[in-house]
Amino acid sequence: VTGASDPNAADADGEKKVNLGDRKTATIEVKNPKKWFPDTPNLYMVTLELKDSTGKVIEAEAEHVGFREIYKVNINDAEQEQMQITGQKIIFRGVNRHDASLENGSAVTNQEIIDDLKLMKQYNVNAVRTSHYPNAKILYDLADELGIYVYAEANVESHYGAYGDHKVPIPGGDSRWVTPVLDRNMNMLELLKNHASIIGWSYGNEATYTRCPLDNTYCFWAAAMAVLNRDPSRLRMYERESDGYYHRYQKDAGADPWGMETRSKNIVDVHSTQYPEAKNVESYAKNTNYKLPYFEQEYAHAMGQSFGSFNE
């Protein structure tokens, strides 16, 4: 422990204090912590206290954190990749979630969020994508506690406004939108970075419809690099830049798919699609030309008739 009065690491049932004095940063090594998994969402409480010169506490903050490691590995001679959490394969059984209340429209109450996530857990849903904007903090707190993976999505969505035939595509590949897109992505990341349930960042939804240059004039490339440099511990996703669209994934033979050398060449870490048929998913998995692990971003839209024709 850097600058600490007690170098012993805490266990799940214990408590240790770090006295930093005038120091502003600290590194704490926790030995053999209980890991966070969806089935065993072990959490630790981190408490920070700010004291004045007399030792009086003038501000205190507390937040849960969990210990788990997200990464990708090559799984065969073709170097196709797999997402893993602390050595175990990740399989998503997930849903997209919008803030939607029968009584209040988009102004959902805390209790409605609690009911949503408890219902998901009861029906073996283990993942949620916050389509298409950051949610209230209680959702991420509950996901930490209940053991639900979260793909956190930034508030960037424009649909037809992103088409290149517009005078000013929004944002599309127009470099004038780099700063706003970066701002929305990094604000989300800084707000939510301590949540164990968040395993990946999504830069936005359906906001590009043309092939854009992979450089900092393209807002989603700029977001990808900023997110990677600030938080290389999580997966990155943007469905409009999936491997199947432009075939732009780059990885040297034998390279570590989770290494910064590989990831800094690429805008996403996973392949994601919308509304595929089952045969298309199978075809992607069997095609050894595709390397990225697969994330089915959207499948059956419930707007309007609420799955009324799902069977058909």
Per-segment meaning from a language model:
Residues 1-134, 142, 146-147, 184, ...:
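Secreted/periplasmic carbohydrate-active enzymes, especially glycoside hydrolases
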Residues 127-312:
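Substrate-binding/catalytic cleft of secreted carbohydrate-active enzymes
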